[in-house]
Amino acid sequence: MRYRRVVTVITFLAVVFVAAWGAYNMIIKHYFRNQTQNTVCYDFMKDKFINNVSAGNNYMNYGLWYDDTTTTLMEANNNLIDFVFNKSGLQHKQHMQVLDVGCGYGEQDLQWFKQMDASCTIHAIDISEAQIKHAIERIGHSNSNSNSNSNIVFEVCDVKDIRLKYNNRAFDVIFSIESAFHYPNRKQFFEHANDLLTPDGRFIITDIMLQNDYSENSWNNKLFVSFFSDFFHIPAQNLISADEWDKQLASAFVVEEVMDVTEKTFGPYYMHFMHTYIENKRLPRFIGDKLGSFFCNNQPFSYRIAICKKKNHE
């Protein structure tokens, strides 16, 4: 009798494991990882989660959280966008040409242009037709009362084609906000971006990579990386350490400044997100506490902001 019970339990656990593994491969690996565009995860996140935590939020970034002074996701998102803009040197300058690669829904471009001279132009590209359509519709809505955004050009474009698309144009500033870790060839993107800069141009990037002390021997780290790389469509070649990322960046640009802001991004983002989502769903608060702590304690990524200038390759 005891033997039969053991066999039954083992069989049940095996069935559960196979079912869970099958569901993971069907839902995560097939639906998210194998899409021709890496944007389905963001559309899903925005519709199912972000709108619950921060209604009307069109940003797709972790934000920059300043201790207790940042209390909402929208504030954190704006903090990050304002921070990189202030590093760009675009303030009070005329006729500046800006390229935003991986613009998503274009929220940052609308915010940046409010602080720019009307003679400037922002070219914003993304691989997602749906997200570009959304951005263009927002431009049209804004222009119903004013022409303040007429110099923002949203277009669908694959990152691998940017050098060909803009071969007769040079940019004073190129932004890459939380997008480069998705690209099949991030190193090539860096090289192409450098080619598109004016002689005094700047490249400003916020990006995600593995922590230097990441260990594949830790099962929870490995599980976290596996899930996130599948869900957010991160190619295996981009799962490199922060030090390796620094070298990759320096091979393409003159790097002026690199800031590790991991402590001001992932941790506070996960705690706020989990608490707010659980609270808005009217579930017990301890669930948000547990989920937030789990993500904070197990996430293996670093978050860096870099300010670069054009490198003249011989």
Regions found by a protein language model. Name each.
Residues 4-51:
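N-terminal auxiliary segments of SAM/dcSAM-dependent transferases
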Residues 75-94:
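Conserved alpha-helix/loop element of class I SAM-dependent methyltransferases that forms part
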Residues 99, 105-143, 149-161:
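Class I SAM-dependent methyltransferase SAM/SAH-binding core
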Residues 163-174:
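A short acidic, Gly/Pro-enriched loop at the edge of an enzyme's catalytic core
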Residues 187-202:
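A short glycine-rich, Lys/Arg-flanked "PGG" loop and its adjoining helix->strand segment in the class I
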Residues 204-227:
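Conserved class I S-adenosyl-L-methionine
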Residues 236-252:
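Short alpha-helix
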Residues 253-282:
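Conserved catalytic loop of SAM-dependent methyltransferase domains
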